[in-house]
UniProtKB/Swiss-Prot annotation:
Pfam families from the UniProt entry: GlutR_dimer, GlutR_N, Shikimate_DH
Catalyses which reaction(s): (S)-4-amino-5-oxopentanoate + tRNA(Glu) + NADP(+) = L-glutamyl-tRNA(Glu) + NADPH + H(+)
Subunit structure: Homodimer.
Name assigned to this protein: Glutamyl-tRNA reductase
Keyword Endoplasmic reticulum: no
Family: Belongs to the glutamyl-tRNA reductase family.
Gene3D superfamilies per UniProt: Glutamyl-tRNA reductase, N-terminal domain, NAD(P)-binding Rossmann-like Domain
The entry's keywords: NADP, Oxidoreductase, Porphyrin biosynthesis
EC number per UniProt: 1.2.1.70
Species assigned in the record: Shigella flexneri
Single biological process term from Gene Ontology: protoporphyrinogen IX biosynthetic process from glutamate
Gene Ontology MF terms: glutamyl-tRNA reductase activity; NADP binding
Length: 418
């Protein structure tokens, strides 16, 4: 059994590739079924966010394993293998465990130490358990990563300052508009990222927020919290002209806001500027919108400069966190090695118990037939000793014949011989 982590993220691939490799929530079950149908895959978890798509797998070693998994990923998303290979990373066993712990702890995020990723990792794990999870080692790896992430946040200052993609989007808005209290903000979506954006905006005294979402119920809960109006996605076209700032983050596979829609809104606004921050993958706003005069479009990749400004205060904490991850990875791998030996131990114990039961049954039968008890017990002890030491004796003899002193010493140590 081998543990693997493979995928792409914001550091290795542009948003144009990340959106093509992402797994939409409504097709995740189908993707997991297809993945687990691969003969080498014992268990799998798919993590797909704005900034990364990763597969965490428990697999049987085989020739061309990497080729087979890359081919599956490319076939599933209809990708050119060469395009994917340039951006794909591949971690195995110790490195896979360490990578997951770093991801869950926010150490591999666009925003160092951001807490949202832990919730996303947990959701990916829960989704994988709905009839898909098969490998206990993979399950244990995820459970361990959750406890490590909690330890990192408790024992370091990695989350001391409020920095996230949502926070960066709000920072960008504050840089462009002198005061947010007089602007109208349209939020598209009602997921976790938009929730964070809405709360940040409320803290900065935004008076008018409109939330457009596919389902009204979820949007209404957030709207009640931040004092916003709720509209349907179909109403965006007619209401877009009211918005000075549009921040969008949905799971839609196709753009929601097109160039024509923004052109009409700008005309109605007499070309007053609009800021559009698209933090969705795949993108919610057509890239061509950025070519329009007075439409200022930013993607998740464009937020990098803002986010970079906030990294300094977290770097010292990250060093401490990396030490924790290294320690916890080492402990987990020790547990994993012990698990791999446990089946051998069970087999060895079962074999010894079988010999014991077989010889004891024969001895008891001999006693019932009136045999001499002392002779029967001596015979039992002799046969039991010979049967139990037969295999170790053969191994010692073979090691001696081969002149393999290292193996001989290992066997001596295993048998408790000084």
């Amino acid at each position: 059994m081998t543990l693997l982590a493979l995928g792409i993220n914001h550091k290795t691939a542009p948003v144009s590739l990340r959106e093509r490799v992402s797994f939409s929530p409504d097709k995740l079950d189908q993707a997991l079924d297809s993945l687990l149908a691969q003969p080498m895959v014992q268990g799998g978890v798919v993590l797909s966010t704005c900034n990364r798509t990763e597969l965490y797998l428990s697999v049987e070693e085989q020739d061309n394993l990497q080729e087979a998994l890359i081919r599956w990923l490319c076939d599933y998303h209809n990708l050119n293998e060469e395009d994917l290979r340039k951006s794909l990373y591949w971690h195995q066993d110790n490195d896979a465990v360490s990578h997951l712990m770093r991801v869950a702890s926010g150490l591999d995020s666009l925003v160092l130490g951001e807490p949202q990723i832990l919730g996303q990792v947990k959701k990916a794990f829960v989704d994988s358990q709905k009839g898909h999870m098969k490998a206990s080692e993979l399950e244990r790896m995820f459970q361990k990563s959750f406890s490590v992430a909690k330890r990192v946040r408790t024992e370091t200052d990695i989350g001391a300052s409020a920095v996230s993609v949502a926070f960066a989007a709000c920072t960008l808005a504050r840089q462009i508009f002198e005061s947010l209290s007089t602007v109208t903000v349209l939020l598209v979506g009602a997921g976790e990222t938009i929730e964070l954006v809405a709360r940040h905006l409320r803290e900065h005294k935004v008076q008018k927020m409109i939330i457009a979402n596919r389902t009204r119920e979820r949007a209404q809960i957030l709207a009640d919290e931040v004092g916003a109006e709720v509209i349907a996605l179909s109403e965006i076209d007619e209401r877009l002209r009211e918005a000075d700032i549009i921040i969008s983050s949905t799971a839609s596979p196709l753009p929601i806001i097109g160039k024509g829609m923004v052109e009409r809104a700008l005309k109605s606004r007499r070309n007053q500027p609009m800021l559009l921050v698209d933090i969705a993958v795949p993108r919610d706003v057509e890239p061509e919108v950025g070519k329009l005069a007075n439409a200022y479009l930013y993607s998740v990749d464009d937020l990098q400069s803002i986010i970079s400004h906030n990294l300094a205060q977290r770097k010292a904490a990250a060093v401490e966190a990396e030490t924790i991850v290294a320690q916890e990875t080492s402990e987990f791998m020790a547990w994993l090695r012990a698990q791999s030996a446990s089946e051998t131990i069970r087999e060895y114990r079962s074999q010894a118990e079988h010999v014991r039961d077989e010889l004891t049954a024969k001895a008891l039968a001999a006693l019932e037939q009136g045999g001499d008890a002392q002779a029967i017990m001596q015979d039992l002890a002799w046969k039991l000793t010979n049967r139990l030491i037969h295999a170790p004796t053969k191994s010692l003899q073979q090691a001696a014949r081969d002149g393999d002193n290292e193996r001989l010493n290992i066997l001596r140590d295993s048998l408790g011989l000084e």
